[in-house]
Regions:
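Trp- and acidic/polar-enriched beta-sheet ligand-binding modules for extracellular glycan
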Residues: 120-123, 148-197
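Disordered, acidic Ser/Thr/Pro-rich linker "stalks" and the adjacent N-terminal cap
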Residues: 5, 68-133, 144-151, 180-184
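Catalytic cores of secreted or luminal carbohydrate-active enzymes
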Residues: 1-3
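Short proline/glycine-enriched turn/loop motifs at strand-loop junctions of beta-rich domains
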Residues: 23-28, 133-136, 154, 197
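Short, exposed coil/turn segments at beta-strand boundaries within extracellular/luminal domains
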Residues: 61-68
Length: 197
């Protein structure tokens, strides 16, 4: 894979996202905007306390270098969740590791940005354990499609819940209606709602 000029990393701790930008190439100046606000020259980790859009870009010798990178950070109940029973994902598209499915960071339109987790020849499956028993009434997930690169939406999304970790009950089922023939690069957010449990 080609080197990306910018890599975005985010850690969530004590109610805050700690965001770090890394240069993929030497001698770059990195800039960012939060929620399309003022442009800031990046010099160190910055802190965000709520859901936000982050746009970053690189400059080298006063000229734009590579494509800009745009991601979304989402605050949600599962940010500190433990992940188990995660099926093996592609090493090429690991999304940042096991916690990529709950880290609150959604990738952009470039599937090579390092923030999408991909599966080949196997279904995605994982058990997400929250740090305490909590009431939930929905699960939101985002999926990416770019048919020219053989990246497709799931055929079906199922959500099960459990209070004790042993007995699971199906709460929601969704079958996305997006055709595999639909052209272009895009992602869709799916909201699966169910009676509060």
């Amino acid at each position: 894979l080609e080197t990306q000029p910018i890599d975005i990393n985010s850690e969530y701790e004590d109610g805050h996202f700690y965001v770090t930008l890394n240069k993929g190439v030497k001698d770059l100046k990195l800039f960012y905007q939060i929620n399309q606000d003022e442009t800031v020259l990046y010099d160190s980790t910055f802190i965000i306390s709520e859901s936000a859009n982050i746009k970053t870009w690189a400059i080298k010798n006063d000229v734009s270098y590579g494509d800009s990178l745009e991601i979304e950070l989402y605050e949600h109940k599962g940010l500190d969740a433990r992940i188990a029973n995660l099926k093996v994902y592609s090493k090429t598209y690991d999304g940042g590791g096991d916690d990529a499915i709950v880290n609150g960071l959604r990738g952009g339109l470039n599937f090579r940005d390092g923030h999408w987790q991909g599966y080949f020849g196997t279904d995605f499956e994982a058990t997400i354990t929250l740090d305490s028993i909590q009431r939930i009434d929905s699960v939101i997930s985002s999926f990416y499609q770019y048919n020219l690169s053989w990246i497709f939406m799931p055929k079906q999304i199922l959500v099960y819940t459990s209070v004790d970790g042993d007995n699971y009950y199906k709460r929601a089922k969704l079958s996305p209606s997006i055709s595999v023939k639909q052209e272009g690069q895009f992602f869709e957010e799916f909201v699966l709602t169910f009676p509060e449990v």
